[in-house]
Regions:
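Extended glycan-interaction surfaces of carbohydrate-active proteins
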Residues: 475
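Conserved AdoMet
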Residues: 58-61
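Primarily short, surface-exposed interaction patches in extracytoplasmic proteins
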Residues: 2-14, 24-54, 68-407, 454-459, ...
């Protein structure tokens, strides 16, 4: 297969900004790059973007789709502390294996422990959470094995329960705050007040001291009977796996089971952990994974290039699970910096040889953040929202308190003003990472494919008619072409028509107009087309929404 030629300077600049920090470059950023004669300017730009605020904010939205992160969960659970914790890990560039280990071994409540938010995503559903965990971090297609031996994969129901037993000595609480709130409510303290105080404390992870998981009532295999206790056992993809250092963990001490599971999963010698995140990040940046789908990597021989997949996993391990460093390697490859290819038909994806990245539409978050750049400028990268203090202020040892102590604590919190309603910012100066996760169904982000966060990797790049109508007639296009938008103000400040046209093309497409485009646009402007109208036209072109 012949490699694609190198991408143009303009296409590569825009691609790097969208893939690394999740938005298009401003005209000033593009001008600065094009003006440089430094032969290392591409590598220098990659380094600059990878340490920027934009990188971690964009990485957060990508990670949120994968982890099914929500701002609010069941039983009035508020995940603001988890949200803050995730963003802090990205800010510190903490190694991926350490982040995952802490999420899997967390204890405490939503009010006291940020990483506890991961397991609390599925309260009272340990089997579902395990299936999601194995899929997200190991690419293991195990969900069917919850109920029976998997008909299309190698996993059995016995193996699934043996893995679930590592969580059998922990309780991820799904307690309903409404019952206790109803019992304690008075004229001085309403049921809603009490729910607000106790909900974050009732959502918690605790240790039971013993492994309590048993086989289900409908278990139908000869290995065990329904109701028999399950003995923890680690998954294996091959006969030699158990010789690996990753498997040398304690599977008997009930107080160490989750830690043993997390140690095994995140170990450099786990057969799938490094290659799974390597494959996911390759897809993020190239448009197609080396092995599709990313949720099913049980047999790496089915990858389009098994040797490449194994090598990428080795890079992640060599980088000590530094995802920023791993992506730096990807961005500096000739393959990434080549011209894009058209996405192959579904039946040909398994044989795609990656002559370059594939042409793809922006994600909903990339589109939103790029639009905010046009409206407000690059200052959006420095704006963040942090609601964790709304949650931590409710922390108290709920399980150790009597009903009277709970009531008095809630009454004191109300008197101190703690029960003031949390107002979530929705301004157009905010990036997608600073908004509610996910946004409401009628929001631009959801209409353009933002994940519902109900399923893993549920975001969509599919186009539809409502999207077209939003771009043509919605509030967003009005904001882009409004007189107080940064884009319009700067365009109108320029002296000549040539400068205005060049500025708008640079702002929307990170390139100058061709001679033909310039002539046609100037003719339209001479005939009465205004700068805002021209911005509307460019905003509605397919070129704006695609990553080339």
């Amino acid at each position: 297969v012949k490699a694609n030629p190198a991408a143009s300077e303009e296409a590569l600049l825009r691609r790097l900004y969208l893939d690394i920090i999740g938005r298009i470059p401003s005209d000033d950023e593009a001008d600065r790059f094009f003006a440089s004669r430094d032969p290392d300017k591409v590598a220098d730009l990659i380094d600059e973007l990878l340490v920027s605020d934009g990188y971690r904010l964009h990485q957060f939205t990508w990670m949120g789709d994968m982890l099914r992160h929500k701002s609010e969960g069941a039983r009035r659970g508020d995940f603001a502390l988890y949200d803050r914790w995730l963003k802090d890990q990205l800010k510190m560039n903490r190694p991926w294996n350490e982040v995952v280990y802490e999420m899997l071994t967390a204890k405490g409540s939503l009010a006291t422990s940020g990483p506890a938010g991961y397991l609390m995503r599925d309260p009272g559903m340990p089997l579902d959470n395990l299936a999601n965990t194995l899929t997200i971090f190991l690419g293991a297609n195990v969900s069917c094995a919850q109920c029976h031996d998997h008909p299309l994969a190698q996993w059995t129901q016995q193996e699934f329960y043996e893995m679930a037993a590592f969580f059998g000595s922990s309780e991820v609480s799904a307690r309903d705050p409404r019952k206790i709130s109803k019992n304690l409510a008075t004229n001085a303290l309403s049921k809603q007040d009490l729910i607000k105080v106790v909900a974050q404390n009732m959502a918690s992870i605790t240790e039971l001291g013993a492994q309590e998981l048993v086989y289900p009532e409908d278990y139908a295999y000869d290995h065990a009977k329904p109701g028999d206790p399950v003995v923890p056992m680690l998954l294996s993809w091959g006969g030699d796996d158990f010789k690996r250092a990753a498997y040398q963990v304690d599977t008997e001490n009930p107080t160490e089971l989750r830690h043993s599971f997390a140690s095994w999963m995140t170990h450099p010698e786990n057969p799938r952990f490094a290659t799974t995140i390597a494959n996911r990040l390759w897809k993020k940046n190239f448009g197609i994974a080396v092995q599709e789908p990313v949720e099913d990597m049980d047999d790496p021989r089915l990858a389009s290039n098994p040797a490449l997949l194994a090598f990428l996993g080795q890079i992640v391990v060599a980088a000590k699970f530094d995802l920023r460093e791993y992506q730096r390697v990807l961005y500096n490859t000739k393959t990434y910096q080549a011209e894009v290819s058209v996405t192959p038909p579904i039946g040909d994806i398994d044989d795609f040889a990656f002559p370059g990245p594939v042409l793809r539409r922006m994600t909903a978050e990339q589109a939103w953040d790029s639009i905010q750049t046009l409206i407000a400028g690059t200052k959006i990268d420095s704006y963040e929202t942090d609601y964790s203090h709304y949650v931590t202020k409710f922390a108290f040892p709920f399980d150790d308190f009597t009903d009277e102590e709970i009531y008095n604590t809630a009454l004191a919190m109300k008197a101190s003003g703690y029960l003031t309603k949390k107002e979530r910012q929705r301004g157009l100066d905010l990036r997608a990472s600073a908004l509610q996760q996910p946004e409401r169904p009628d929001h631009f982000l959801r209409m353009f494919g933002q994940s519902s966060r109900e399923l893993i990797d549920d975001g969509s790049l599919e186009g539809n008619i409502p999207q077209t109508l939003v771009l043509m007639n919605g509030q967003i296009q009005e904001m882009v072409s409004a007189r107080d938008a940064k884009l319009i103000r700067k365009a109108k400040s320029l002296d000549s028509m040539d400068e205005q046209v060049e500025f708008l093309y640079l702002s929307f497409f990170s390139r100058k107009p061709t001679e033909k485009e310039s002539d046609r646009i100037k003719q339209a402007m001479e005939e009465g087309t205004s700068v805002p109208d021209l911005a509307w036209v460019l905003f509605n072109t397919p070129e704006f929404l695609f990553v080339q």
